[in-house]
């Protein structure tokens, strides 16, 4: 496969971190569950539990209905949930992932100070590491998990290392 080829083609001076990343990918394997609903999920319970999210659920119903008419796996448009603290945005995302039967990954932006934490650092850097999104996809069971980037408005860091740049 492509990962094996990339590992074999690494130059002798390649970083140990990059080599370890490829090896980790090989150990994890290339197979992931890819969620594709056969029927429209029952959003009614979720809508009763979290009535503030009715408009979002309507959009999701439409996206999922369209997906069901194709051969493609479920891919939802990224969404920004706005609202006061405590209205249930994170809870909504967790419940949505459960309803869809896919993975859930949480990334708290208030504590991130560098852009590479989300997207990963370039292999040219000595201590390069993959980012949180990579970790969710390689270490998770699903190819299309729900990934929550929480408190995006609280992302810190100067413009040179802006964590939002990778989004």
Residue ranges and their predicted role:
Residues 70-74, 97-100, 137-142, 158-161:
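Conserved catalytic network of the ASCE P-loop NTPase/AAA+ motor domain
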Residues 37-82:
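Pre-Walker A (pre-P-loop) alpha-helix and adjacent loop at the N terminus of AAA/AAA+ ATPase modules
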Residues 1-41:
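Interdomain "pre-motor" coupling segment immediately N-terminal to P-loop NTPase/helicase cores
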Residues 59, 95-96, 117, 162-167:
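Alpha-helical scaffold elements adjacent to nucleotide-binding pockets in ATP/GTP-utilizing enzyme cores
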Residues 46-47, 103-124:
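Conserved P-loop NTPase mechanochemical-coupling segment
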Residues 75-109, 138:
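Walker A/P-loop
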Residues 124-148:
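Conserved alpha-helical scaffold flanking the Walker A/P-loop in AAA+ ATPase domains
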Residues 141-167:
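Conserved AAA+/SF3 P-loop NTPase catalytic/coupling segment centered on the Walker-B
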